[in-house]
Amino acid sequence: MVLIRVLANLLILQLSYAQKSSELVVGGDECNINEHRSLVLVYSDGIQCGGTLINQEWMLTAAHCDGKKMKLQFGLHSKKVPNKDKQTRVPKEKFFCLSSKNNKEWDKDIMLIRLNRPVNNSKHIAPLSLPSKPPSQDTVCNIMGWGTISPTEETYPDVPHCANINILDHAVCRAIYPGLLEKSRVLCAGILEGGKDTCGGDSGGPLICNGEIQGLLSVGGDPCAQPHVPALYIKVFDYTEWIQSIITGNTAATCPP
């Protein structure tokens, strides 16, 4: 079963992306407290997601993480004992691809958020660069988030977990996800042997390759971390022109077809 990996209090909110749920990092370890400065914890109408700061006033997450009441936390590591430089913001503006709100296309699950006021760079807060080129097959990339660390139980950690996974051939995911087009603007990533994966509560979180934000978690298997069931990540490189156009003031910019 394919699930969008989102945590809604103590239950998984199932959305219309072929009934996917949000996810957390399974098979990883606690992230180094100083090595996830761009990671954002997103609370949206009771749902937990991840996100990525791309400059002091803008961030990215998945479109299916949208909600009427959103709280965005920066510089967070432990939820119970927050860093002194933790900052909280809310959205000022939100931008979507035209079709993403209809939940009909695999590759339009992206939301660009302008913060109500800029965050200040600090020891635990800094933006991540947009990609200069797409990642090649077999590139080792990093996933991270506060999602569940068990593929079968709701075991949510106090701190974010990180793991390394690989960029896989697009054909691997096409064989798993019905309706995924050959030219969909997504990345297929995971560990074919299983054991490491994003999972419930990680939706919208980053796929980081060579120090750049290459993907946003959108869709994965249920249960998480199964052999031969990688996840789908929105291919950020294909949206860089749209993102940069909006940030520079062209709010009427359209997403790539």
Curated annotation (Swiss-Prot):
Cystine connections: C31-C162, C49-C65, C97-C255, C141-C209, C173-C188, C199-C224
Tissues and organs where the protein is expressed, per its UniProt entry: Expressed by the venom gland.
One Pfam family matching this protein: Trypsin
Gene Ontology CC terms, in alphabetical order: extracellular region; secretory granule
InterPro entries with a match to the protein in the record: Peptidase_S1_PA, Peptidase_S1_PA_chymotrypsin, Peptidase_S1A, Trypsin_dom, TRYPSIN_HIS, TRYPSIN_SER
Domain of life: Eukaryota
Glycoprotein keyword on record: yes
Record keywords, A-Z: Disulfide bond, Glycoprotein, Hemostasis impairing toxin, Hydrolase, Protease, Secreted, Serine protease, Signal, Toxin, Zymogen
Annotated EC: 3.4.21.-
Propeptide stretches in the record: 19-24
UniProt subcellular location: Secreted
Entry's family note: Belongs to the peptidase S1 family. Snake venom subfamily.
Protein name: Snake venom serine proteinase 11
High-level lineage: Eukaryota, Metazoa, Chordata, Craniata, Vertebrata
